[in-house]
Structures are given as C-alpha cells and as structure tokens.
C-alpha cells in the first residue's frame, strides 16, 4: 500500500483560525472551526498517515537564537485564552484520528522537516499543510506543501514565480536578503533583487564569495558581511536531524467509527 503522510503545521493553522474569530476569547469556536478545517484536509488529502506538529508554548526561541541573538526577539506570546484552550483543541483533533507531536525546545518546523524529509527520501508521498514558505526549501518530487487558506500548492512553479529560484537556493536567498519578520538580517544593502541577481549567477553564497566574477558592487558587502550571511542562512534553513522518538506505524490514520 502506497504511503501518503500528511503533516499539519498545527499552530500555523490554529493561529489563523483564531485571529479570524469575532470573539477571540471564544475557544470553543476555534475548536469547532479547526475541527471543520481538519475534516476538509482529511477529505482533500486522503492520508494513510497523519500527525499535527505543535511548537512548545515557551518563549524559549531555541537554537536559532543562540546563532542569531535577535532572532524572533519581538515574537508576541500566544494569547492567554488560546494557550489555555490548546488541550481542548488537541483533544478534538485526537477524536478525529490525529495525534499530536509537541516539540520540546525544538521549533516545530525542524520536527516537520525531519519527519517529512525522512519519509520523502524513501520515495513516499508527503504533504505539509502550512502557509510557511520556509518549508519550500524541502520540495522534492515526493514532498509538497499545501497552503490550505489560499487553496494553492507551494510548489516549484510557485517558487519560480515568487522568487525566481530553485527550492534548494531559498536558504541562501534568505541568508543574503534576510527575513525582516524573524529579525534575520542577511547582508545589509542586499535586498530581494540583489539576492536574486547573485543567485542567478552563482548557485550558493560560497560560490559567489569565492568567484572573481562577483560584481564589484557586491564585493565589499561580501567581504564585510560574508560570515553574517552564512549564519543567517543557517538560521533560515531547516534541520532534518531531530530525534523523533516514534515510527511511521505510530501515526497511521484510522478513521474514527
């Protein structure tokens, strides 16, 4: 039997549902709405295996903040009402046949990346349900990303249209241009257009730095901020070596009776 693993970026989904509620203290409405959303995802994707991955609730920003101290330093804490309602949300999803994986100090995206990469590398189908374009660096013939809210696939044609690059160049792109919302600086003075120009000419940051053909207008910036770009790329990248502590059989989807 062919495997189709669906991984739900849980807080990505829950926060969007919660922010759309007229009364954001009404957690039962969030439970009900996310339940309907999960049922639609199940119908659309028809998984053989499924899991929802949750970030830990702590303000600990994980290993990325050790590399870049300003990383997500202004991240707003989860609203108190929503935090208190997380157990109810997880319980409602469990009743729909979906188990939860809670990170313990690791960011959810690294857990998602590790599991997705592990299964996709065995030529099994994986779908990540998330609006987070960061997952697009994982794209492969057997790994895809579904933006449920925009009803679109974040696939290679999307990346080509959005960034003009290949998925495997995205971390280098963010290493150069930065991600302002996460306080990933990149190289000061190099924005999206310059990053695209550089990565169209060279496959990686290292290749650009080592080449005599790097345009002069960028050479001084590279000389000054090359190490910063490498660190920013590391933080923008995804780890795929997290210890998961379970196997695929543990998350086989069984439709509740």
From Swiss-Prot:
Superkingdom classification of source: Bacteria
Region: Interaction with DNA, residue numbers: 189-194
CDD domains on file: H3TH_53EXO (cd09898), PIN_53EXO (cd09859)
Co-factor note (free text): Binds 2 Mg(2+) per subunit. Only one magnesium ion has a direct interaction with the protein, the other interactions are indirect.
Cofactor: Mg(2+); K(+)
Enzyme class: hydrolase
UniProt xrefs under Gene3D superfamilies: 5' to 3' exonuclease, C-terminal subdomain, 5'-nuclease
Alphabetized GO MF terms: 5'-3' exonuclease activity; 5'-flap endonuclease activity; DNA binding; magnesium ion binding; potassium ion binding
Keywords (A to Z) from UniProt: DNA-binding, Endonuclease, Hydrolase, Magnesium, Metal-binding, Nuclease, Potassium
Chain residues that bind K(+): 176-177, 187, 190
InterPro entries reported in the protein's UniProt record: 5-3_exonucl_a-hlix_arch_N (IPR020046), 5-3_exonuclease (IPR002421), 5-3_exonuclease_C_sf (IPR036279), DNA_polI_H3TH (IPR020045), FEN (IPR038969), HhH2 (IPR008918), PIN-like_dom_sf (IPR029060), Xni (IPR022895)
EC number, UniProt record: 3.1.-.-
Residues annotated as binding Mg(2+): 109
Domain annotation 5'-3' exonuclease: ranges: 165-255
GO BP term, example: DNA replication, Okazaki fragment processing
Family: Belongs to the Xni family.
Its biological purpose: Has flap endonuclease activity. During DNA replication, flap endonucleases cleave the 5'-overhanging flap structure that is generated by displacement synthesis when DNA polymerase encounters the 5'-end of a downstream Okazaki fragment.
Name of the protein: Flap endonuclease Xni
């Amino acid at each position: 039997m062919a495997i189709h693993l669906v991984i739900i970026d849980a807080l990505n989904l829950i926060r969007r549902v919660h922010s759309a509620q007229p009364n954001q203290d009404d957690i039962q409405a969030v439970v009900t709405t996310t339940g309907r959303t999960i049922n639609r995802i199940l119908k659309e994707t028809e998984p053989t295996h499924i899991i929802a991955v949750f970030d830990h609730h702590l303000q600990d920003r994980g290993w990325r903040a050790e590399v870049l101290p300003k990383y997500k330093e202004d991240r707003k804490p989860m609203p108190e009402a929503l935090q208190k309602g997380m157990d109810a949300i997880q319980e409602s999803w469990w009743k729909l046949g979906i188990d939860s994986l809670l990170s313990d100090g690791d960011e959810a995206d690294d857990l998602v990346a590790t599991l997705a990469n592990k299964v996709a590398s065995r030529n099994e189908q994986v779908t990540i349900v998330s609006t987070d374009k960061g997952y697009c660096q994982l794209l492969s013939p057997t790994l895809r990303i579904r933006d449920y809210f925009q009803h679109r696939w974040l696939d290679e044609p999307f990346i080509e249209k959005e960034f003009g690059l290949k998925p495997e160049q995205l971390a280098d792109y963010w290493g150069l241009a930065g991600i302002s919302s996460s306080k990933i600086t990149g190289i000061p003075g190099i924005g999206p257009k310059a990053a695209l120009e550089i990565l169209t000419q060279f496959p990686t940051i290292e290749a650009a730095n080592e080449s005599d053909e790097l345009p002069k207008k960028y050479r001084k910036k590279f000389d000054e901020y090359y190490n910063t770009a490498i660190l920013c790329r590391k933080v923008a990248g995804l780890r795929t070596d997290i210890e998961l502590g379970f196997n695929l059989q543990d998350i086989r989807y069984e439709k509740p009776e």
